[in-house]
């Protein structure tokens, strides 16, 4: 039980570190020097008031003496040892961290630093071949990382190292890390200046998502009779890349058509009566339910205080529009949960699905979803229609009998549901309890 | 005494770390930090094994190695090359220049020691 038996060693370590004589500590703790000597050599157990007294004299938390270094530090040291592949005595890692907390922390910090740097170096290796300035900076960084790595490994090894060498290596790591900080700062500045344009905000789809989120999915320029897409473009598309401007213009053009067909003053009255129920509203307004869903997602807070979420995907399942809700997040990249009614709608085009859904780990009444797949564009002759699916997510309506909500997720990677037939990749989360 | 290692590398703290590890394992370690006259230093010292960095001031490690391999006296000298670039292209270049072994920075200390031992049969 190393944890139990090392309290004495830690007391001794701490006492020596702050320059207190054994006899002085014994006197102030009210015990004999020989008894303290036995404690310090882990031959007598110590606890209770005596431990508290000694901790007070040594000016440390009693748990520092009984438990030594934190579990996180120990775990990091273990990882370091396994990664660097040295012959470190893993069974004595507790003792090392307890007796040399400063060195142990330094080692852990070095490893964290090495990991970060190795990662950034990996990411940048591709560019290395193309850019001489980058190649030089990266070479410098790699050299410095190598020096730190080697030196830290020597310090991490078990066994005695001459104190002069120890000091020297410590100083080398310090110097190298300063140099590394300087080089990386220079590199970041260089890369930021270099990537000022196209790569800045990611894909055009992400730019579209960001622009729509910034305007709250509501575009006042398109709500008036003479509203123009150009005016809206000028405000929303200013900083967007050309491709994103194309996507944005398409979306705004569709918005304008929806707004012309279902102007706010027409929507207001049935909305007060039915709430954001796309089926009831489509009946009341004699309108296309898909259009009603899109329209609901654009309503301002004074008309619809509790917003609705909307997802639109193309026939490949790729999300083309996303307006998430706090209780219904949507993945920013990659595929969403295959259990979403959005995708079931693609299985049954033209059938409006309406059902309660629940995300994992959320309590309360859950949410209600409507999903519908309709052909996009004109009906082609002797050719397949290209379908597009929409899913509206709204607060649970008051219904007399609530069916069991369908369990859905956000995306497999962040989903805790283990037993799921639709799972396509392992989750990074621990399984739900 | 396990033998003499000549380390040609321009990064002082890497030199210090490698020197420490190898010396502790019983090797006699000589160092040199310049590419220009590196080949002459190798000839003068005639080490049992050469550890050669690729990116050296003045002259590339590949050039130095090619020159040594053309010299019958050093055609069989064990050479461990160090490089900061892991692309297969670099490995290929090192092999073509005649490196006995190739190691990418950052490396593990134990790997350097193992490589030195393996290459010299020590």
Give each language-model segment a name:
Chain B
Residues 107-117:
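C-terminal output helix
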Residues 9:
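Conserved acidic carboxylate
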Residues 15, 57, 75, 87:
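The feature encodes the CheY-like receiver
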């Amino acid at each position: 039980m190393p944890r139990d038996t090392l309290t004495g060693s830690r007391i001794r370590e701490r006492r020596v570190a702050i320059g207190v004589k054994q006899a002085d500590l014994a006197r102030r703790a009210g015990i004999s020097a020989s008894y303290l000597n036995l404690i310090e050599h882990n031959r007598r157990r110590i606890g209770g008031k005596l431990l508290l007294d000694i901790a007070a004299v040594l000016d440390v938390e009693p748990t520092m003496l009984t438990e030594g270094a934190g579990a996180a530090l120990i775990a990091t040291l273990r990882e370091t040892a396994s990664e660097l592949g040295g012959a470190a005595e893993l069974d004595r890692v507790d003792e090392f961290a307890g007796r040399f907390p400063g060195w142990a922390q330094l080692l852990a910090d070095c490893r964290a630093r090495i990991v970060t740097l190795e990662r950034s170096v990996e990411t940048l290796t591709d560019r290395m071949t193309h850019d001489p300035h980058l190649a030089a900076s990266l070479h410098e960084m790699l050299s410095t990382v190598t020096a730190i790595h080697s030196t830290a490994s020597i310090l991490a090894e078990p066994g005695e190292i001459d104190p002069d060498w120890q000091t020297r290596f410590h100083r080398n790591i310090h110097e190298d890390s300063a140099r590394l900080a300087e080089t990386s700062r220079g590199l970041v500045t260089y890369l930021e200046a270099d990537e000022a344009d196209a790569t800045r905000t990611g894909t055009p789809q992400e730019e579209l998502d960001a622009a729509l989120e910034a305007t709250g999915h509501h575009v006042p320029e398109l709500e008036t009779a003479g509203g123009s897409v150009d005016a809206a473009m000028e405000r929303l598309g200013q900083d967007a890349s050309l491709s994103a401007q194309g996507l944005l213009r398409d979306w705004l053009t569709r918005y304008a058509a929806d707004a012309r067909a279902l102007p706010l003053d027409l929507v207001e009255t049935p909305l007060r009566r039915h709430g954001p129920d796309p089926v009831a509203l489509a009946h009341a307004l004699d309108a296309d339910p898909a259009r009603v869903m899109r329209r609901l997602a654009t309503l301002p807070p004074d008309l619809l205080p509790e917003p609705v979420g909307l997802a639109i995907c193309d026939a490949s399942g790729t999300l083309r529009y996303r307006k998430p809700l706090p209780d219904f997040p949507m993945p920013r990249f990659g595929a969403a949960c295959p259990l979403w009614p959005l995708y079931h709608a693609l299985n049954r085009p033209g059938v409006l699905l309406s059902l309660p859904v629940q995300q994992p780990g959320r309590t309360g009444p859950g949410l209600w979803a409507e999903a519908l797949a309709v052909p996009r564009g004109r009906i082609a002759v002797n050719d397949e229609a290209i379908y597009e699916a929409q899913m509206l997510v709204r607060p649970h309506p008051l219904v007399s009998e609530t069916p069991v909500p369908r369990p859905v997720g956000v995306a497999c990677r962040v989903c805790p549901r283990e037993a799921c037939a639709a799972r396509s990749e392992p989750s990074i989360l621990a399984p739900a309890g | 005494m396990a033998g003499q290692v000549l380390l040609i590398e321009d990064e002082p703290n890497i030199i210090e770390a490698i020197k420490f590890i190898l010396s502790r394992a019983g090797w006699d370690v000589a160092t040199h930090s310049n590419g220009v006259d590196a080949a002459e230093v190798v000839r003068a010292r005639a080490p049992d094994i050469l550890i050669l960095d690729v990116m050296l001031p003045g002259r590339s490690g590949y050039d130095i190695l090619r020159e040594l391999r053309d010299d019958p006296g050093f055609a069989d000298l064990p050479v461990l090359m160090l490089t900061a670039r892991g692309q297969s292209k670099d490995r290929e270049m090192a092999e073509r220049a005649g490196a006995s072994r190739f190691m990418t920075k950052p490396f593990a200390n134990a790997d350097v020691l193992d490589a030195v031992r393996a290459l010299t049969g020590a």
